[in-house]
Amino acid sequence: MLGPAFLPFLGVIFPRSAGKVCSSGNISEKERKEEMTMEKIASFTIDHIKLQPGVYVSRKDKVGDSTVTTFDLRMTSPNEEPVMNTAEMHTIEHLGATFLRNHKDFGDKTVYFGPMGCRTGFYLLLAGDYESKDILPLVVEMYEFVRDFEGEVPGASPKDCGNYLDMNLGMAKYLAAKYLKVLTHIDEFPESRLVYPE
């Protein structure tokens, strides 16, 4: 089983000079700049001007004989709506991860669930080769769990979490309900909310 440290969406690419030893111990400034050139990662090639809330396949990675599918659970319109605050995102992360890890069908297929740095959504990594439509019921179920949750947020204690005070259940529930309006009417939009825009 792959662990949560497997984060392919980060797409880090090491320079070609990694591990390269020069006889002089030095390289020219021009060579250094050439060696440090990095490719744009896949997630930066998506047109965020056209991107709207939905469920998208971000990438698929082969790991040995297995496939890991990374999903973009986009909750807000990039650069149009206010981004989510860390407290509600943190709460959704705790609740979503708890839900997924305990799911009867996807618990052992869940590799990772966590927030995007831009704070417009979450990444969900599942072991298996999936399309957006395959997991739409799972995502709806998860956000219904967040929307309807009452009580103490799992893991919201100083022993269990490194920033346990940064939680906002009320806003997490509100945002989950807002996203569910998209998910439950996903086929009614003029543009696809299951495939990235061209």
Regions found by a protein language model. Name each.
Residues 20-37:
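Short, Lys/Arg-enriched N-terminal segments with co-localized hydrophobic residues
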Residues 181-198:
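Histidine-acidic residue clusters that define the catalytic metal-binding segment
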Residues 34-79, 193-197:
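Non-catalytic terminal extensions that flank enzyme cores
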Residues 7-10, 15:
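Short hydrophobic targeting helices and cationic amphipathic motifs
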Residues 68-102, 112-113:
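Active/ligand-binding-proximal structured segments within catalytic/core domains
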Residues 113-185:
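Active-site-adjacent, His/Asp/Glu-enriched structural segments that form or flank metal-binding
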Residues 103-107:
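Short secondary-structure junctions
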